[in-house]
Each structure stands twice: as C-alpha cells, then as structure tokens.
Amino acid sequence: MLSIAKRVFWPYSSRAKGASVHKIVKSINALEGEMAALSSEALFGKTGEFRKMLSEGTVTLDDLLVPAFAVVREASRRVLDMRHFDVQLIGGIALHRGMIAEMKTGEGKTLVATLAAYLNALESKGVHVVTVNDYLAERDSEWMGKLYSALGISVGCITSSSSDEARKAAYNCDILYSTNNELGFDYLRDNMKFSRENMVQRGYNYAIVDEVDSILIDESRTPLIISGPVERDSSLYGKVDALVRDLEQEDYDIDEKSKTAFLTEDGALKVEQLLISHQLIPEGSSLYSAENIIMMHYVGQALRAHKLYFADKDYIVKNGSVVIIDEFTGRMMDGRRYSDGLHQALEAKEGVRINNENQTLASTTFQNYFRMYKRLSGMTGTAETEADEFLGTYNLQVMQIPTNVPVQRVDLDDDIYCTEEEKYEAVIDFIIECHKRKQPTLVGTISIEKSELLSKLLTMRGIKHSVLNARYHEKEAYIIAQAGKPGAVTIATNMAGRGTDIKLGGNPEMLARNELAGITDEEERAKRINKIIEQAKHDKEIVMQAGGLCIIGTERHESRRIDNQLRGRSGRQGDPGLSKFFLSLEDGLLRIFGSDKVRGMLKRLGMKRGEAIQHKWINRAIERAQKKVEARNYDIRKSLLRFDDVINEQRKVIFAQRNQILDRETYDLVPFYSNLNCDIVSRIIKEKYCDLGHRETAEELSAEVTRIYGIELDIGALSALETREEVIAYLDKVADDLLKKKADGFVHKDENLWDFAARRVLITSLDHLWTDHLAALDSLKCGINLRSVGQKDPLNEFKIEAFYLLEKMLSRFYEMVIQKLAHIELEVQQQPDDGMINLNNSTSQLFGGIARNDRCPCGSGKKFKHCHGMIKV
C-alpha cells in the first residue's frame, strides 16, 4: 500500500517542491544586482552580519537562505570566476533541505555544495563535505577554499596521511572536506582514546555527501572495522589450500549469487581422507565431528578462495600482498582485508605471505555513522533508481535537478551476441570505426582482466590506446585529461565513473601541468599555456564534428546506476555524445541472473556467428535481471542494518559510558565504585549465602571476597551476623573501606594519581571486554538464521541473545574493575632522587598506548613524560 501511495503522490510532491524552489531562485536572482554593486569589503563582511543575526536569534538559517546564496554566487564570480546557474541554486536548496540532489555529470556539483556548506557553516557547528577519495577531498578543499576564505569561513581537509593534531584542527574548522572512510575511522578511533583531549571529532551537525549513492548504498554492506591480530595457526591455510587444489567439479557445489561454496557428500569424504593422510585430523575421526569443526572453516574458505574469488577481478596481487578491488569503483582498497579467514585463504592460494587473522576491536557501518548527523544531504548523478532505499534507510528524498543545457547524448540499443568472443570482435570493430572519424572512445569493463584482454586485442589491430585500472591508478588524472582528445581510445574499469570530467578536446589545465613540469621561465610557460589552450579549442571542434565522446559498455553491471554512471561520462553540459552496450549470453549478469526463457529464445532463433540481436524486449529482460539483483542486494543491506541496529544500540551505550569515565570534570568515580561494590556484594550474597550461623556459608562468602578483593575476612565475626541485611552492610563496608584505603595511599603520593589509575583501569577493562563482546556477537550473528528452522524469528532471537550477552559482559566488567583496583599496589623505589613511582605488574597495562609527548590524560596540562609518564611500570 505504501509503495502504491508513493507512486501516486511522489510526482505531485516533487512538483509542489519545484514550484516553491523556483520562487526562491527568483528571489536570489533579484538580489544579484545589489550584491554586484557592493565593494569587496562589504560583500565579504556579510558573513559577520549573518552570524550576528543568528547569535541574536532574530533569524534562522532558512531566513538567511536567499541573501546567503546571493552572497556566495557573487563571491564565487569574483574569486573563482564561476557564477552559479539557476539549476545549481536549485541543487543548493535541495542540499540545505536535507535532500539528495540528482545532478548529471558536468553540472558542477562541487560548486553547488558551496551554497549549502556556506549557509550551514554560519552556525559555527561544523559542516562536513564528504568525498570518495583523498584526491577529491584535497582538490575541492583547495579549490573551493579560496571562496570560503574570502568570506571569512575556515576550511579544513583530512586525508589518510593527516596527523592527529591536523585532524583536530580540521574538525574545528567551519567546513571540513574529507572521505567517508576517514570520518568513520576517526569516530572509532576517538572511542578508543584514553583522554578526551586526544579526541579529534567535535560532533555531527550537517553533512553533504558527494557521490552519495556510492557511499551510502554501495559501501554500506562493508562495515568499518578496526582490528588487531589474534593468535591462531595461519600455516593451516597453506596446508588446506594444497588439498583443495586436488578437488574436482563433482566434489563441490557453488552458488555465485550468494558467493557460497559447499562440499558434496563425495567431496566431504575425499577431503576427510586427505586431511587424515596429511595428519591434519586424527585417523578414524569425522570431518564433521566437534573437534574438527575448525577444519571445516579452513576448508570452506579455501574452497571459496579458489572457486568464487578471482585475481584481476576481485583482487590483485601487488608487492607480495593480496589487495581487494572495489567492485563498484574498480579501485584498490589498500588496508582493507576480507574477514573470517577468507583473506588468509586468498594469500595461501596466491602463494604470498599469510598474515595472522584479526580480531575486531571496534566497528560500525556507514549506515549508522551517517545517521548520527542531525542533518544529512547528498549529491550524485544517479540516485532515482535507489530512491526507495534512501527514503527508507536515511529518510532522504531525491530531487532531480534539470540540466542547465539539454542533454544531447544519443543512447543506442544494446547489441547481444551468443558468445563473449563474438562480442569482443564487434567491440573492436566499433572502436576502429570511431577512431577513423576521430571520435574519442571510452570503453568500460567490469574487471582488470577484461580491460587487459581488450587492450591486447586493440594492440593486435594496431590501435594506440590507454588503459585505466587499479594497476595504473597513479596515471588516472593524466589518462582522463587526454581521454577527450580526437581519436583517443581509453579502456577503463569503473574507476572512470566517479569524480572526473572528460572534456572534449582534452583538459588544458591538466595537460599544461604535465607539460610545464620543470619549466621555470615565465615567458616560456605563458607561451606554452597559450599553445595548449588553442590546441584544446581546435581539438574540441574536431571532436564535436565527430559526434562527441563515445561510450562503449562491454557488459551490464549488476546495478543500473553503474551503467548510468558510465553513460554519464558523455554528453556533459550539452555536448554531443553517444553510448552503446555490447553484451553476450556468457556475461555474468545474464548467466547468473538472466531468465532461462531469454537464453532459450535467443538460442532458438539460430543466430549466425557474429550476428547481433537488438530488441526492446531484450533490453527490458536485461533491466528486469538488474532489478532482481538490486532488490536482492537491498534485502541484504536491510537485513544487515536490522542486525547492526541492535549492535549499534549497545555500541552507543558502551561509548557513552566510556566518554563519561573520561570526563574528569563532571563524572565522580566515588559513587560509581560504591554502586559497583553494592552490585558485587549482592551477587556474592545471592550465590553463596545459604543459612545464618553456618560456618560453611561464612567460609564460602570469605573465599569469594578474597578472590575479588584480595582480603581475608574474620570468619567468626561473619558467622555471628544474624540477618542477611547485616551481612550485606558488613561486606559493603569492608569493600568501601578497602578502596578508600587504596585511594588514600595513591593520593598521598600524587593527588591525581588514584583518579588517573582508576579511570585507566575502567577504560582498559571496558575496551577488553567490548572486544570480546563484539566477537561473541559476530559468532551469534553467523548462526542465528538457523533459528528460522524452529519457526523463530532470527532477528528477535538475536535481540534476546545479544541483550543477555551484554548483561553478562557488564557483570564481568564490574567485577574486573573492582578486582583490578583492589589489587593495585604502590611501591616507592629505593632511589627516590629520580622522582619515580613504581607500580606492581598487575597495573603495568595502565599506561600503555600513550606517547611521551602527548598531553597527560590526568588533566594536568603537562606532557605525559613530565607527569604520569614519570611513573615507571
């Protein structure tokens, strides 16, 4: 019912919004003359006026939208020599309203972001502009930073190489440019820090996400994980890999849709015998017995590595390491590793060094990270196909922004061939036709392997070309700069689909940067620049007459958005262009997800070799296959989100508790200890207290108190207590007195030492147990779907079990903290002249992880080496 209502009413609501938007644009345009008449000092001083009005509460951001946008437009004209078009103003309004602005390639999304970023920066609460890679973050912050700086708005940029000091300074700027990965990992790292002073982020006010579909949808299935090595025998991966290589096709079944692999009955018996013969499991035992269950894990991952993950498609081997390739962008994902032992299995398969498995220390998802922002917006060229998901997951509506100039690109029907070989022959012939008429061609492939196959075929035909894939990513900017030159042929994976504009005739700025490297003579530089600009203009005319940039797709992607992104490289800003896809029945999408009816019909037609079919019915069938995959992937993302929402609620509780502990100014630990003691005493009484007057009961109580607190009780005095309440009061007093005595001993040496040590104990204990808890939740999540066999809802079961595990973890946390604090001892060294205090071994972990030049977490303001860093552990 809801989906029907959306289809009926959504167009109406869009038109209504459009009408109000055009009125706002008209108001902004009405101020253009007034702003143009202002002096630079008066124009750039508007920021101070706006901020004063906001601080006085006389206006809201919505009230300032029209004058603020007018100021940005005029400032941009003066500083950047770029004036916002009316359609760009509409995009800025959509962003400010917390919507997704769908804008075609080349429509100036980078400039659009300045409107909403400036307006929201006036509150001084922080605006985050999120991009997909470091290059774009640096480029946009430097480029648009000139505009912001002129308006008195501070701008920061964070990349993977930024230091903690630089990160903190950047987060404190009015506007921050960074990548989704850096923001997400900073959030996790902040919640692993040992002092608030070392945290870098300051809140989640407003974010503009560029390429929003890539970040919030494509990457949402991949969690952000900070991990540490775990002790496990990695050599088994190599031993099992050698055995799996001997398996034949009848020994296993694979499901390419879900990327899972299973041993058949015969295959399991074969693997069992191989494991026994290689002394990896005991003779006479079963592969499926409890003691060998871990071996099933190794075998399963080795099978997946060999049969479902392929070099130059899913990953590449670079400098002796297995590096994952992003399926959506075609870029290398340095630092990312497959989880659950799959990466180790791939390393064994490729014969490179097998690294240890990792344990999750902290994790989150982009879905839950970006939902922390009070207001969220985004930009992309392709969002409408995922509008339902944006609305359902992020409460983001999509506004389609019209192009400034009508799109001139011609999208031809797909050609479908029987075999891959015939398809590539047709692709090469089509490229040669374009090349002859000087029409530049961008050929999109889905993998490195396919891009290099095409490159080989073109070389055999004597066609000069460039290849852009994860192997040659360093040359990306230069290759793209030349991709629009007359007759240029560029073969690319999905890397060419994001954040880059292919200008007809070539990009003179980028070409000049490469040609002028090393030339210092200003006169010579000016002469070369003019020559490059004139050549680019001449080349553009040639390309325009040839029909503009031609896009050739060699395979349909699982997502229609990726295909649309490839097409969107052509026809920018009203330029002419052409796009065409060449497909075969052997392509992955048609083979795995296409209907048998389509394949059967094409085969019955008796197509001759080299003959292609073009029909709208076939195009619709392919679109149905893509929709089927998109719906399946959406279901996977929804399921992952529902489970992660459960974990996220616990994550928020633990992180909030952690931040409270770190807050020395407002969080008093004394009541906290007292409450912990009460909880522990209550638990001891519940478990050990049986009957009054029994010496056995008193001895059991005493033994438990000794285990936790390290002190022995007077059995006689304890036995003499007559009521349960008296026992509780007695034990409470003993516990409180012990901790008070410990605290007094520390404070006597240094008034801040006990507080520092106690908070350190709390944090390290919480972090340790949270890590174990995440591992337990991962294990629970892996098998929870089996509960559906018993007619139980896996999600509800997960919620119940996860809550039980959290209660268990907190109970262990309370006991661990009290036990550690109760056993801390201070020992003064025999040589007091060096001013050091020695703590016993039980507390040596308290001071790990703090650099000597960091501020001391005790809050003194001194460097750690001059404060508690003098404590010798």
Swiss-Prot record:
A GO term for molecular function: metal ion binding
Source organism, top-level taxon: Bacteria
Compartments it resides in: Cell inner membrane; Cytoplasm
GO biological process: intracellular protein transmembrane transport; protein import; protein targeting; protein transport by the Sec complex
Alphabetical list of Pfam families matching this protein: P-loop_SecA (PF21090), SEC-C (PF02810), SecA_DEAD (PF07517), SecA_PP_bind (PF01043), SecA_SW (PF07516)
Cofactor note: May bind 1 zinc ion per subunit.
Keywords noted in UniProt: ATP-binding, Cell inner membrane, Cell membrane, Cytoplasm, Membrane, Metal-binding, Nucleotide-binding, Protein transport, Translocase, Translocation, Transport, Zinc
EC number: 7.4.2.8
Protein name in UniProt: Protein translocase subunit SecA
Organism: Anaplasma phagocytophilum (strain HZ)
